[in-house]
Amino acid sequence: MGAAASIQTTVNTLSERISSKLEQEANASAQTKCDIEIGNFYIRQNHGCNLTVKNMCSADADAQLDAVLSAATETYSGLTPEQKAYVPAMFTAALNIQTSVNTVVRDFENYVKQTCNSSAVVDNKLKIQNVIIDECYGAPGSPTNLEFINTGSSKGNCAIKALMQLTTKATTQIAPRQVAGTGVQFYMIVIGVIILAALFMYYAKRMLFTSTNDKIKLILANKENVHWTTYMDTFFRTSPMVIATTDMQN
């Protein structure tokens, strides 16, 4: 469960930092009226993920974009080397970005600024917008809890969506492996139990159930060894019976 726990921890940390950065750098607030509302949130293939929407809105879309990027950079910097090693593959799978551990921050910043400053995003004046994510996995017995932070602008929400695509892609890569690993561990345990049971039955049979040949061997082994002189003494102590030939004739 370690990988799933680390993903959930990263998701929580990222959400907290985004909220904090939006508040500090973009004057965002949960009480500010949002120009854009999230209508529906779709996960095309949902395998154990929960979602909540949180409003942290402001009027400064550019500051929102910078705040989200700052939160993402700090969160990435706090990952372990092992966790960072997974990130480039996540970028390729989720955003079709070819990157490396050393350039991932710069590449993500370039992607977000180029994508979220495009006319398709900036000119989107819809007051109610929908968000669509491909798929998300939760670990067995431990659902992944996601939080989409509505910034109130198309730019800010574009950056938030890019981050969510990355985090959900991470769940699709790690959680299924855990399921497979759990199955392997289960069969390993079953095989181990069968082997131990077979050994127990073998020794129990040897101890509790003795074959006829083994019984004979045990009797002979426990029988007193008699010296040959004992047989001589017995012979001479016992008077032999003499049968006369005349008696036989009669």
Curated annotation (Swiss-Prot):
Myristoylated. Disulfid bonds are oxidized in the cytoplasm by OPG088 protein. One of its GO terms (biological process) is symbiont entry into host cell. Residues 2-12 are annotated as: Targeting to MV membrane. Residues 205-250 are intravirion. It comes from the Viruses. A lipid is attached at residue 2 (N-myristoyl glycine). GO terms for cellular component: membrane; viral envelope; virion membrane. Residues 2-183 are virion surface. Induction: Expressed in the late phase of the viral replicative cycle. It is a single-pass membrane protein. Disulfide bonds join 34-57, 49-136, 116-158. Keywords: Disulfide bond, Host-virus interaction, Late protein, Lipoprotein, Membrane, Myristate, Transmembrane, Transmembrane helix, Viral attachment to host cell, Viral envelope protein, Viral penetration into host cytoplasm, Virion, Virus entry into host cell. Component of the entry fusion complex (EFC), which consists of 11 proteins. During cell infection, this complex mediates entry of the virion core into the host cytoplasm by a two-step mechanism consisting of lipid mixing of the viral and cellular membranes and subsequent pore formation. Component of the entry fusion complex (EFC) composed of OPG053, OPG076, OPG086, OPG094, OPG095, OPG099, OPG107, OPG143, OPG104, OPG147 and OPG155. Except for OPG095 and OPG053, each of the EFC proteins is required for assembly or stability of the complex. Belongs to the orthopoxvirus OPG095 family. This is Entry-fusion complex associated protein OPG095. It comes from Vaccinia virus (strain Copenhagen).
